[in-house]
Curated annotation (Swiss-Prot):
UniProt organism field: Chlamydia trachomatis
Organism placement in taxonomy: Bacteria, Pseudomonadati, Chlamydiota, Chlamydiia, Chlamydiales
Record Gene3D superfamilies: 2.60.120.1340, 6.10.250.3190, 6.20.30.20
Stated consequence of mutating residue 61 to S: In plasmid PCHL1 and plasmid pCTT1
UniProt name for this protein: Virulence plasmid protein pGP3-D
Range of residues in the leader sequence: none
Organism domain of life: Bacteria
Recorded consequence of changing residue 138 to S: In plasmid pCHL1 and plasmid pCTT1
Keyword annotations from UniProtKB, A to Z: Plasmid
Miscellaneous comment as given in the Swiss-Prot or TrEMBL entry: PGP3-D is required for growth within mammalian cells.
Pfam families to which the protein is assigned, alphabetical: Chlam_vir, Pgp3_helical, Pgp3_N
InterPro entries: Chlamydia_pGP3, PGP3-D_N, pGP3_C
Length: 264
């Protein structure tokens, strides 16, 4: 065992040995390792520090060995700030989203200095209109279906752009289907068709479509509304033609010009 043996230190029997093995350990302890008990046999383990914790090991053979565990104030400070920052900013972001999105939308759709409003072509319809025309299998591919409730002329500002068309019509009828048809001037049949329903009370019937522009020439469109094979449809009114809640109600047709994104 080399320099090995026993000696009496005060009242304690001490053992000193070179390359001693404890339990099932197969090699001597290395620098800064300690013996760690387990549920079976001891093992050699090395203590390490995690974020925010400082670990100082003094194992100079000429001095008393020591292990000092403390708090790394700088790292702990940064960790705490990061955690709090994430939570605070997350809460602020949620609050901003909840409280200001509508304000932003209202701003960009009402401020005439912003380009988005200029891109919209809005056509409000405020009259009460009785639509006696019907849409049937015989006339759906013609221009005879339904009743025209409005005409709209729009001029593209950019060749190759497209119009996103949105029609929201307040319609009432005795229970049954409602048909909306968008007609482009010069065509022999509707450009787009949509369907809605009324159970005797006013309902919002919508049509959504896109129109690709090939030039800068003004084009006129019309919107036709009618019952699905039967029934009279009222626009902006109750199914008997009276005002809804005694006030003027407004349907709307809008054209939004957009330019498709390219990879160029």
């Amino acid at each position: 065992m080399g320099n090995s043996g026993f000696y009496l230190y005060n009242t304690q029997n001490c053992v000193f040995a070179d390359n001693i093995k404890v339990g099932q350990m197969t090699e001597p302890l290395k620098d800064q390792q300690i013996i760690l008990g387990t549920t079976s046999t001891p093992v050699a383990a090395k203590m390490t520090a995690s974020d925010g914790i400082s670990l100082t090991v003094s194992n100079n053979p000429s001095t008393n060995a020591s292990i000092t565990i403390g708090l790394d104030a700088e790292k702990a400070y940064q960790l705490i700030l990061e955690k709090l920052g994430d939570q605070i900013l997350g809460g602020i972001a949620d609050t901003i989203v909840d409280s200001t999105v509508q304000d932003i939308l209202d701003k960009i759709t009402t401020d005439p200095s912003l380009g988005l409003l200029k891109a919209f072509n809005n056509f409000p319809i405020t009259n009460k209109i009785q639509c006696n025309g019907l849409f049937t299998p015989r006339n759906i591919e013609t221009l005879l279906g339904g009743t025209e409730i409005g005409k709209f002329t729009v001029t593209p500002k950019s060749s190759g752009s497209m119009f996103l068309v949105s029609a929201d019509i307040i319609a009432s009828r005795m229970e049954g289907g409602v048909v909306l048809a968008l007609v482009r001037e010069g065509d022999s049949k509707p450009y787009a068709i949509s369907y809605g329903y009324s159970s005797g009370v006013p309902n919002l019937c919508s049509l959504r479509t896109r129109i690709i522009n090939t030039g800068l020439t003004p084009t006129t469109y019309s919107l036709r509304v009618g019952g699905l094979e039967s029934g009279v449809v009222w626009v902006n009114a109750l199914s008997n033609g009276n005002d809804i809640l005694g006030i003027t109600n407004t349907s709307n047709v809008s054209f939004l010009e957009v330019i498709p994104q390219t990879n160029a």
